Amino acid sequence: MPWRIHKKRHLTSFQVIILGFAGVILFGALILMLPISSAQGIITPFHKALFTSTSAVCVTGLVVLDTGSYWSVFGQTVIMFLIQIGGLGVITTATSVFILSGRKISIMQRSTMQNAISAPKVGGIVRLMSFILKGTLLIELIGALFMIPVFCHDFGLRGIWMSIFHSVSAFCNAGFDLLGTKWHPFVSLTSYAVNPVINIVIMLLIIIGGIGFFTWEDIYLHKFHFKHYHMQSKVILTTTLCLILLPAVFFFFQDYGNLSGIHRLLAALFQAVTPRTAGFNTTDLSMLTGASKAMMILLMLIGGSPSSTAGGMKTTTFALLLLNVLATFQRCDDVTAFGRRIDASVIKNATTIAMMYFILFFAGGMTISVYEGLPLSSCLFEAASAVGTVGLTLGITPKLHILSQIILIILMYLGRVGGLTLIYAVFSDKNKRKARLPLDKIIVG
């Protein structure tokens, strides 16, 4: 029988990305299981360690164990590093290690880096990675320095560690906090609801981390000359501004009637910023009106911007869907923005991503509701928080059974790796149809 020669198969860059995230999550879970990771020196059950590690790497912030009271300083440090790796991306972090060690980056590694941060080209990718790493560390350091006086006033020298942790958590849009205690767990930033320093610094870190690395580069190179920015940066900044101001006005008039002028404005602004994948909260979310919860679900699904520390289906996806609707109203064949025509394939990708997120959101929420016997609205809120990698909760996540927590783990993972990355990793382009079939039309609407 003749020998068959099998061609050696290599992992694609997209497969490397999704397996890289999975590997870091599993490694983090094993470390968090160790007695040294818990404050009481006990072994943490695997499913709870896995949930925490997934939430950290996927920069979500949903927790089943209070971060401030359950985990030791070692465990909290592990969580912070997992957040940093997840925020920058597994590939970006690994590349940063290569850059710092002075090792050469291969063409395959450069291609993987390009796909990891959705860079338009391979050229200059190492320089961009270096810019991202330096910018991240500088911004997180500045954020921590601003918060140190407040936290040191309340917690003494421990406030330095808390400032660093919360700065990393906010910049990476993770939403983990250390403010819970054994008697009052899962409190987030509610004790700082009227503190302007903490509110403003956390909001700025969330926004800067969520607008994307390429937008940073545009601002760095062109300063505040908006007309010189790339179209993507223009779309991101415009959409981000609208998604902050409009919901803030809504929250201002809809909720927080118990707060006075400036404090009410601060709470409304914070509540508009944090659902876009950050996960911090300064007020009790269970007390919000149904309309406010619905608004937050929409914001959680939209998320941050491409090539950023944030998750969700992304601001550009949402903007392109709206622009497509606008083009239909105007009876235009092309979707345009800022004097440029947008490729039809990009619109198709945006529609695909949006459908994936909405399907995962509804399927996850309904499954949890049926299994747990909880109100559908509450379960949809948790599902949106998971798939949008946000971390906001109505308080039911720690009380869910293991199966429901596994569903949230899957949603967090899929929400972080991204719709297109998952599609390109699973489905080969060999299935791409080479010949074009006859054109036909279907009546819609």
Where do the protein language model's features map onto the residues?
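Membrane-proximal intracellular helices of multi-pass ion channels
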Residues: 1-445
